[in-house]
């Protein structure tokens, strides 16, 4: 399973660890992902999504029905 938020599309990005001597070694910055069950009142069922913390805030703001409609529009499985 890839580390991608289903709502926002956030993915890992690359950067550098920097030591005190400013040596650079490659690293990955991973999104803050959680598998979370959301209750969909219109369908009377739970839906499990792999979302970032930002994705949860988007769902709080727009509502789960709107977000699921956007996922369906781009043929995302959930």
From Swiss-Prot:
Alphabetical list of Pfam families matching this protein: Ribosomal_L28
The UniProt keyword set, sorted, is: Ribonucleoprotein, Ribosomal protein
Gene Ontology MF annotations: structural constituent of ribosome
Q: Membrane-spanning regions, if any?
A: none
- Identify the InterPro entries for this entry: Ribosomal_bL28 (IPR026569), Ribosomal_bL28/bL31-like_sf (IPR034704), Ribosomal_bL28_bact-type (IPR001383), Ribosomal_bL28_sf (IPR037147)
What's any one GO cellular component for it? cytosolic large ribosomal subunit
User: Which biological process terms from the Gene Ontology are attached to this UniProt entry?
Assistant: translation
Q: Which SUPFAM superfamilies does UniProt cross-reference here?
A: L28p-like
- What is the superkingdom listed in this entry's lineage? Bacteria
Please state which protein family the record places this protein in.
Belongs to the bacterial ribosomal protein bL28 family.
Tell me the protein's name.
Answer: Large ribosomal subunit protein bL28
The organism of origin for this protein = Shigella boydii serotype 4 (strain Sb227)
Gene from which the chain derives: rpmB
């Amino acid at each position: 399973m890839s580390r991608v938020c289903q709502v926002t599309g956030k993915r890992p990005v690359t950067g550098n660890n920097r030591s005190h001597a400013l040596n650079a070694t490659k690293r990955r910055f991973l999104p803050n992902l959680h598998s979370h069950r959301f209750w969909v009142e219109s369908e009377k069922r739970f839906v499990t999504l792999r979302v970032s913390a930002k994705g949860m805030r988007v769902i709080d703001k727009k509502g789960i029905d709107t977000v699921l409609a956007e996922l369906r529009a781009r043929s995302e499985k959930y």
